[in-house]
């Protein structure tokens, strides 16, 4: 029996509709209505350091030799011990510190400087795979062996990145998203240590090396920069989805190699400088 062109067209159209319906069923968004969401019992945001360092992907940027590694080492030791830092509670648990620019001898010297007692639940590595070669699996394996892991610090982020020249927003964002997904999967804090750009910027949070895709994909970002208020100090600028914006004035104690708090804008909001003054100081500083 001959089939007319109109019938063939109708049959073809029906097949396409069935195929598209099947595809669309698989591509539907997974959604939840507001009423159901409000009735769900969800875990509150967890913190490695209460109100300061949330679970998820965090990034700490700072100029070379300013003291980022000293700060991260102190954080990891205190989390492993369950000791407060700057009067903020820590969640006690295993800490992993990938010191990829250091040797074990240097780490030992620094530990001797900052503490009299090194806890057994802080672990160090001086080499690791790149992200494209299996870093995430290495961290997964460590957390599997140490289920109480609270923090994994990577110092520095640049060492584990892909070895290419792509510094676009899309590439930066995607790399950070991979590590954020890992932090969310393992329910830990991953803290990346990163460098700042050489050129100045009136907004400290725009100084991270690379595009804004790096800070944009992170749960929290911290910039340790030369203080605009004191000659021998530093300011830690903090911002994130689950923390309040704050500026913490710090002083480096050369005797015990620890960063000590001078003031905190969360407790004393009046110490925040107006944006115009901040921009002027930054301009003058980078002209010197």
Task: Enumerate the language-model features and the residues they cover.
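Hydrophobic positions on the alpha1 helix immediately C-terminal to the Walker A/P-loop
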Residues: 71, 75
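Conserved inter-motif catalytic segment of the P-loop NTP-binding fold
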Residues: 26-29, 35, 43-44, 48-49, ...
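Phosphate-binding/switch region of NTP-binding enzymes
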Residues: 59-61, 65, 69-70, 98, ...
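Short, small/acidic-rich helices and loops at N termini and domain boundaries
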Residues: 1-26
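C-terminal regions of RecA-like/P-loop NTPase motor modules
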Residues: 20-24, 30, 145-148, 185-186, ...
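Pre-Walker A (Motif I) flank of P-loop NTPase domains
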Residues: 54-58, 93
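Gly/Ala-rich phosphate-binding loop of Rossmann-like dinucleotide-binding domains
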Residues: 80
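Short gly/ser/thr-rich secondary-structure transition/capping motifs
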Residues: 38-44, 202-206
């Amino acid at each position: 029996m001959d089939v007319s062109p109109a019938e063939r067209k109708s049959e073809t159209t029906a097949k396409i509709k069935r195929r598209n319906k099947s595809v669309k069923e698989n591509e539907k968004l997974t959604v939840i209505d507001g009423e159901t969401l409000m009735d769900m019992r969800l875990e509150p945001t967890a913190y490695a350091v209460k109100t300061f360092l949330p679970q998820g992907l965090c990034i700490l940027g700072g100029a070379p030799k300013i003291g980022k590694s000293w700060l991260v080492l102190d954080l990891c030791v205190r989390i492993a011990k369950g000791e407060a830092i700057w009067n903020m509670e820590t969640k006690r648990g295993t800490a992993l510190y990938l010191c990829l620019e250091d040797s074990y001898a240097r780490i030992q010297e620094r530990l001797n400087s900052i503490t009299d007692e090194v806890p057994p639940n802080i672990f160090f590595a001086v080499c690791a795979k790149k992200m494209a070669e299996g870093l995430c699996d290495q961290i997964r394996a460590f957390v599997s062996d140490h289920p109480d892991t609270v923090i994994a610090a990577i110092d520095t982020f640049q060492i584990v990145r892909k070895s290419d020249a792509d510094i676009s927003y899309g590439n930066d964002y995607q790399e950070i998203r991979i590590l954020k997904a890992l932090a969310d999967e393992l329910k830990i804090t991953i803290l990346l240590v990163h460098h700042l750009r050489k050129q100045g910027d009136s907004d400290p949070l725009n100084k991270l090396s690379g595009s804004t895709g790096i800070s944009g994909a992170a749960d929290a970002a911290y910039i340790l920069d030369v203080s605009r208020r004191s000659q021998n100090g530093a300011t830690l600028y903090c911002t994130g989805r689950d923390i309040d914006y704050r500026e913490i004035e710090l002083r480096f104690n050369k005797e015990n190699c620890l960063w000590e708090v001078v003031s905190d804008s969360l407790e004393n909001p009046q110490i925040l400088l107006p944006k115009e003054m901040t921009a002027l100081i930054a301009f003058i500083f980078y002209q010197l």
